[in-house]
Structure formats: C-alpha cells, structure tokens
Amino acid sequence: AGDGAGSALQGGFVCYSKDAKVRMLGLPSETLQTRLGAVTETVARLMAEGARDRSGAAIAIAVTGVLGPSCDEDGNPVGLVDIACAV
C-alpha cells in the first residue's frame, strides 16, 4: 500500500466458507442453499452490499469463485468467478 492508502481502504473480509458469508456479511443462508451454491452473481452482489454495510465504507467489492483443484461442492467448475461492486 502506498502513502495515504488508509484514507482509501476501510478494511476487508475473507469469507471463504458459506457459513462465513452468512455470519460476517449477513447473507441469507437460503441464498447459498440454491442449486448453484455460493458462486453466483446474486451472491457476489449480496457479499458486496454486506461488506459495504458492515464496514461503513462508501464502496465495496466482492469476489466469489471456485479456486480448485476440482469443482466445488455445488458442481461449479474451477475458474468460475463472479465479481460485484456496491456503491
């Protein structure tokens, strides 16, 4: 981080598990129980909104995806990524 980064970066959340997304960002657990699971456009949007609301930041970015080495528990393929921004 460069000089003054503290004035631009409020903080961050690492919510790898579905439970963490519910506990830390306030996602409805029902949203994560759908056929597509935690890697969807809707989940990314809700994560960004939760991060914004809980951090007090004006803008939040969220990324959810499947890192690998194999598909996730919901059958989503490695490399699938959803990104959202909440303003």
Where are these regions (language model features)?
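Short alpha-helical segments enriched in small residues
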Residues: 1-87
